[in-house]
């Protein structure tokens, strides 16, 4: 049987657990399980946290105290370990099991666990301390012995005696490869003909660098990391959420979740690494360099996936902290508060039975040492009907509908049910009024049937009539690209009604009212669609795990990726001046919008009216608003008919993209509340099709081409939309343009002869040349006006946002300041004087509100100077390129 530890705060209402502030969050509720965010695979796939280990990654070893001059390794564990009786609830830790230290963690001071041989997923016959097989064949650590691995113990003793202060002890030494191979062969030979305890490393080599390399190779072949696959998420969340002081206290309890063999190996390896770090002056290896080498030994996910790159720095910080604070972490944990309580659910143990069980395991704290009042409180807590996880790290959760009696019945009647859920990850308590609960195996939840969810016909509302002026404008766009123009302009008409529904409130999903109540839409309920994915070959628990992974994947990864793809498309459209390319880009957004509208309504009975109602009730955060409301109205008097159409298509694309972001935001918040697996699968299919549409190349690209090919062609084609410019310039190659330069500047360079062989002799363009390129004038005028308008909006928003919003504005201001200073340096211009720093206000928010407005004024002055520098014929073509590209970058960064 499996067990896990659930933590909860003490409550003053007779032991009723306090409400967790995140317990009802639709964004966080889905990660309260063993297979949380860190175990996600691609959309719709299962990341099996119990898969086979990666032979290329390191695995932990154990070092024991040497009888010589090695430093003592703190450990409260006993060498005694027993197999539990059928009534015990412990598992050995293997590739798919997790060790239980329920009793140990309950008392808060033990470091020894017992294991049930009947439920172990590891063949314990392999765990022979005198095993003479190939030690480099991936033999697992014995979880039932004090040291876990005898050969690892020998490596540690050897290096603690004569190698911990050797320079570069764990660095690669290619010149020693031959000696390393010879020592390995002789070691395997000695072990095959004798007892492992009798083997001596000193007779094989006197070079500690050789033993250090062999030790690393041994660790690399261990099948599971020292902290186990199951605790991967717990360690990352503990490090990310808790303060440095609380981390050390919490890590002590995480250590209790591992078998005694693993704990001994961890203390052995960390004892050696800590000693090497202490002698970093001679070894030339500190905690940081050691953490980079050994972080995979202690922590790695079961599957090395894309998110591992972002996790790697955190893993190194965790191992670095363990190395530096090893003496502190290795001490037995104690209850941080005398008011901490322990509840054992699902058992009928009396005080005498608890004492007897404690006496059977000498390493566990003596129950009799606890006061009688505390024991009585423990037994009274058994009758509580609901258990909740700690609000800080909600890794486990028990449904409130399950009482302790039902838990007990389930455990007694089906202790080895093949459908029992996997062991959930533990939770770490904060260092304040805490109540620790040891909870038995979570019973199987009843599967909801589609008939229990009524399907209501959503009430759709007719959109308001489209203005006649808009229709006339659309009808005027029927020329060469009639079909494409009509489709895009119709998108503009259909989506104009969304403008009033998009609020630029700086509200993050975590700050939404959805955190405190369940999402619902009046008069609307999701109907269960027919699932195309077959779960017939999966068990009920595997289906639940798969659905949970899909939920978390859509919530945390897929929705953000889709939003980023849309933003990149809008950026490409805004910077594009080729009419045909604009049509192709906008057609992709049009198809994506059509897919979201039709698929959502067909598979989930979601209409645009439902989405609009949801957005009105829960406004989108600023990052999801893709409509640029501050764009000044351009004077289109001198525009050609084709330029007017291109401008209309750009605005229609913005409206369509904003409507897609409405759907993405809706699913991001609602996915965690879907009860039926068919709803989750349909949502995953919708997002999968959306990503394929957004990632597809434009229709005109040949098969096998990519977006990068299209963008390169777009940047190198010198096609001018102005009929007055000579078309012969399109035959020149724009090879000298920077990768970040826009197609506009490519045309400007070509028209000014920058691609000719006499580049160095080219004089700055005359006023007539600059005036002739209307695109250059437009882009500088529009960007400067938009940027200054955004500064005005930031100034007004600064007066009503909270401290977090003010920090965001300050962060964007810092970026703008850096870019503008870069322009002045590259163009060799004299910057305006810096703003005099104001004295700090009463608090941070007041200080920001005083300091940022003068900075906005300075930005406006700098932008005016740069535009005049171009229009007054003082800028060279290179300077124009820099100014235009930087202004585009500032405008885009502020709009996001």
UniProtKB/Swiss-Prot annotation:
Subcellular locations according to the entry: Cytoplasm
Site feature Arginine finger, where: 171
UniProt-listed PROSITE patterns: RHOGAP (PS50238)
Biological processes per GO annotation: signal transduction
Ranges of biased composition (kind: Polar residues): 27-38, 702-711
Pfam entry (one): RhoGAP
Alphabetized CDD domains for the sequence: RhoGAP
Inducing or repressing factors: Down-regulated by phagocytic stimuli.
SMART domains: RhoGAP (SM00324)
Region (Disordered): 1-97, 375-514, 701-770
Entry keywords, A to Z: Cytoplasm, GTPase activation
Stored PANTHER family: CHIMERIN FAMILY MEMBER, RHO GTPASE ACTIVATING PROTEIN AT 5A, ISOFORM A
Function: Rho GTPase-activating protein involved in the signal transduction pathway.
Protein name: Rho GTPase-activating protein gacM
